[in-house]
């Protein structure tokens, strides 16, 4: 069956992969096919094969899924950021629910009946409050775009349909100004030019960061950008390291405007800096924070939030708990969070700058912690944090995850001392394969 590699081969797609690709089987070997949907029969060209799996390029669809739709985005297939834009929204939710279900069963042996129906996003398009787009050149002009998956091929973008509409309007206005001043895309040899345009918006106000080489932008251009309606702050970040995983460079300069962009969440005002992490779907973030507050429950509780960042979750819990302690290792984020608590007149929340596992171990020996909230990166909780949680006597853990695989593997460890309670998935990123999940764990 594998002879004639590169020629058309027929595959029936049996399920969806964690990155939104279709998975079929040839001689019992899984074949990953981006762009194919569950139930479809497709013709592919095999592009890669090893001892465990193969990858295929979709040539044509022989039998279409009834759930397939025409994507609104003309570069959807080449961009690769929104693999589920080719199927209707109900099917997207079903895929995500099933991905979470299979992962929890496989790694953590969780009773799937505990998984509640995924909370859909009110918006399926135009929902992202931030864009982080690379820059390139097209027909002599500076443009934004995306790189094709697993390549250095730049695909110019006219409109991104998952960014909020006013964010897209502002992005295009910024590009016009940059082109009027003949700003060019980054040149690796000269180490000059613009690498990324980063834009975040709340309540009609915008924070723009230009990630560039070592150069000084024209003062006339800066003045013109700051004069754009809604421009709240303008930053420059110098990043010349080619292989750095960090989007921002070590050098950040405020070119004009206010240092922080402010987000109103109920009665709380959150100051957001360019490096601050905040969920990209504002409405779903508010819904998730409300769910976490509900799970905390007891208004007399001591709550500790590990990896607290700028303190968004901690702030959301300040009126739910008697005392909240946030732990974050990034100093700027801690200073940001402390300023937020001070500006909002909140006196029952404190933020500590420390390694999360080390400080949690110390606190758990000194205090009786009722609830621990963890919202780790995609890599999940490390061994040190898992060990501290298991050794502690924390009554309840609320685990917020953006990765079903690492979540499930962590739960497999934590179930040595904790019982899994409610499992609440949220669709934070419509048209992508990603799913956010909140899991309640109760100490036995």
Q: Language-model segments: what does each one mean?
A:
Residues 201-213, 269-273:
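Short, aliphatic-rich beta-strand segments
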Residues 153-195, 214-242:
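Internal alpha/beta scaffold segment
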Residues 2-7, 18, 22, 217-444:
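Rossmann-like S-adenosyl-L-methionine
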Residues 1-75, 350-351, 358:
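Terminal RNA-binding accessory module
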Residues 59-71, 78-187:
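Extended interfacial segments that mediate partner engagement and assembly in macromolecular machines
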Residues 116-123, 194-196, 424-428:
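Short, solvent-exposed loop/turn elements at beta->coil junctions and helix N-caps
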